[in-house]
Amino acid sequence: MQFTQLVALALALATSEAAHQGFNYGNTKSDGSAKSQSDFQAEFSTAKNLVGTSGFTSARLYTMIQGGTANTPISAIPAAVAEETSLLLGLWASGGNFANEIAALKTAIADYGDDLAKLVVGISVGSEDLYRNSVDGVKAKAGLGTNPDEIVSYINQVRSTIAGTKLSGAPIGHVDTWTAWVNGSNSAVIDACDWLGFDGYPYFQNTMANSISDAKALFDESVAKTEAVAKGKEVWITETGWPVSGNTENLAVANLANAKTYWDEVGCPLFGKTNTWWYILQDANPVTPNPSFGIVGSTLSTTPLFDLSCSASSSAAASSTAVPSASSVAGAKASGFATAAASSGAAGSAKPTFTVGKGPGGSYNGTGFWNSTSSARPSSTAISGSSSGSASGSSGSSGSGASGASGQSSSSTGSSSAPSSSNILSNAASGLSGSIFGAVVAVCLALAAL
């Protein structure tokens, strides 16, 4: 293999294996009105072009259903196709309407085929259902939850639904708070998942020392606890953030300066290294929730409310704390999906848990979801406008999390027989987790073998 070919292959591997970074997107605005395709497309375009960043090109969805419909596929899908935004699909699993989620998934596969498949990072069955079903969730009036056996049943339904389709290789997981993951009664869900989604918000850990100076340690601790029970499965950061405005939670003050600090200390080490979906791009349109986590204000703009640039020191910290293992990279590559990230990533939980499944009148409406949220922190309370909540992902938050150093760089470079230079390149690039540094090292190893 020629030198130029080696370099090209190494860079291609590095690019394809970089972790996904994006935001959470609900199917409604902060007033409960349904988002349209143009709304999603504007958000995805903004996220890709945020000043000070390399672009946030992935979207985590809470539901497959378009707001205001029974089971029409969410218009975020054609918007993502148009903007080339990768997708962590979500099916809402609380409230007894799962058949409509499955129907929307089937229709989306039929309608979008390869265009959808090439964008799918994975599929999440549920979001914080186990937390809402817990003693703490009930006490916090977090909304309808689901028991672990039902989540496992839903996961199996999704596997059956996608079998033999364009999405047959998509990894399936569940998103919940770290407190739910470490609860042994939920272990069957871990067994059923290909990956675990971690939601964590130190801001809401108000029974602990949770000032901004404590936030990274709290996040890291909760991620580590989640990874400890994950049985070797990847943990993805599916929700975390710090509010730009809102009430003070014990020692946690919601303001722009602290949101920036949290971004620097927690976000920057994750971005590009661990699959991460931040909470949230915008939650103040048209109504500003309390607390508000949006990094842009009420007007959608590529100019954020605070500086999003990450320093070199943050990047260096990332390479030492969130490098996926070679096995997780290989597994991701084998799926043939939008596995731009084979991250064994840190994961935790306790996001703004959408107390979904209820309409404004308090009964399940089976369509668009109302939009308040409560959360998974210790002794959480309903914190946004209504007591119902939703797959909208647009307000409130809670819980705790931890950034955990996950994964290890396990490059495989030797064997009993002399491998070819191309094999060395491929193995080294996989083992070094797709970073540019890994690609450079891979090239050096390959050249040394020539």
Swiss-Prot record:
Topology versus the membrane: Lipid-anchor; GPI-anchor
Annotated coiled-coil segments of the chain: none
Annotated region (Disordered), positions in chain: 380-420
Propeptide feature: residues: 428-450
Gene3D superfamilies linked: Glycosidases
One Pfam family from the record: Glyco_hydro_17
Residues of the signal peptide: 1-18
GO molecular function: glucan endo-1,3-beta-D-glucosidase activity
Gene Ontology biological process: cell wall organization; polysaccharide catabolic process
Disulfide-bond pairs as recorded: none
Lipidated positions per record (GPI-anchor amidated asparagine): 427
Residues with attached carbohydrate: 183, 365, 371
Subcellular location: Cell membrane; Secreted, Cell wall
Recorded catalytic activity of this chain's protein: Hydrolysis of (1->3)-beta-D-glucosidic linkages in (1->3)-beta-D-glucans
Active site as annotated: 128 (proton donor), 239 (nucleophile)
InterPro entries tied to this protein: Beta-glucan_modifiers (IPR050732), Glyco_hydro_17 (IPR000490), Glycoside_hydrolase_SF (IPR017853)
Source species, domain of life: Eukaryota
Composition bias, Low complexity: 380-395, 405-420
Enzyme Commission number, as recorded: 3.2.1.39
Family: Belongs to the glycosyl hydrolase 17 family.
The protein's role, per its UniProt record: Glucanases play a role in cell expansion during growth, in cell-cell fusion during mating, and in spore release during sporulation. This enzyme may be involved in beta-glucan degradation and also function biosynthetically as a transglycosylase.
Annotated protein name in UniProt: Probable glucan endo-1,3-beta-glucosidase eglC
Species, as recorded: Neosartorya fischeri (strain ATCC 1020 / DSM 3700 / CBS 544.65 / FGSC A1164 / JCM 1740 / NRRL 181 / WB 181) (Aspergillus fischerianus)
